[in-house]
């Protein structure tokens, strides 16, 4: 692996750990040239289905799009990076488990909402407002009321 600091080819692994419930390997590396240290994350690359967008276009699944959408909803919220990564892994595993070659973006959106509801209710409402295209305050109220009812049912 190339050093991100000096671009030398030779690096050594200083430490390796399983993270995200064993779905990733976190490695601390050290450059043998400049001796800078950096972290890498390793995950198995698996074929994901195409995403069918609302307008009918088909695009490859990009985990970075999933992550950035969730990060936007979670901005300035007390959710750890580890919890976010676990949620992303849960979503991608569910998508893969379905075994379909194509999956509707609405299905992905519902999976994201399920994970955000579990992680942080404010982030859930933020995401829902964009995903469900809220038109006015009544849409927010309706979503919050639904959340309250779900919380009562769980109690």
Swiss-Prot record:
Pfam family, one: Zn_ribbon_NrdR
Domain ATP-cone: 49-139
Cited NCBIfam families: transcriptional regulator NrdR
Organism: Legionella pneumophila subsp. pneumophila (strain Philadelphia 1 / ATCC 33152 / DSM 7513)
Record function comment: Negatively regulates transcription of bacterial ribonucleotide reductase nrd genes and operons by binding to NrdR-boxes.
Cystine crosslinks: none
Keywords: ATP-binding, DNA-binding, Metal-binding, Nucleotide-binding, Repressor, Transcription, Transcription regulation, Zinc, Zinc-finger
Cofactor comment text: Binds 1 zinc ion.
Stated name of the protein: Transcriptional repressor NrdR
Similarity remark: Belongs to the NrdR family.
């Amino acid at each position: 692996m190339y050093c991100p600091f000096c671009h030398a080819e030779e690096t050594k692994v200083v430490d390796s750990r399983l993270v995200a419930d064993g779905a990733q390997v976190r490695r601390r590396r050290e450059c043998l040239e400049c001796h800078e240290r950096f972290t890498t994350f390793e995950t198995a690359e698996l074929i994901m289905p195409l995403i069918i967008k609302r307008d009918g276009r088909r695009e490859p699944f990009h985990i970075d799009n999933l992550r950035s959408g969730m990060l936007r909803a979670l901005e300035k919220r007390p959710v750890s990076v580890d919890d976010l990564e676990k949620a992303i892994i849960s979503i991608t595993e569910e998508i893969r488990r379905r075994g379909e070659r194509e999956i509707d973006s609405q299905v992905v959106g519902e999976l994201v909402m399920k994970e955000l509801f579990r992680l942080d209710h404010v982030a859930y409402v933020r995401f829902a407002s964009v995903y469900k295209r809220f038109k006015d305050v009544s849409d927010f109220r309706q979503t919050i009321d639904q959340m309250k009812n779900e919380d009562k049912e769980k109690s």
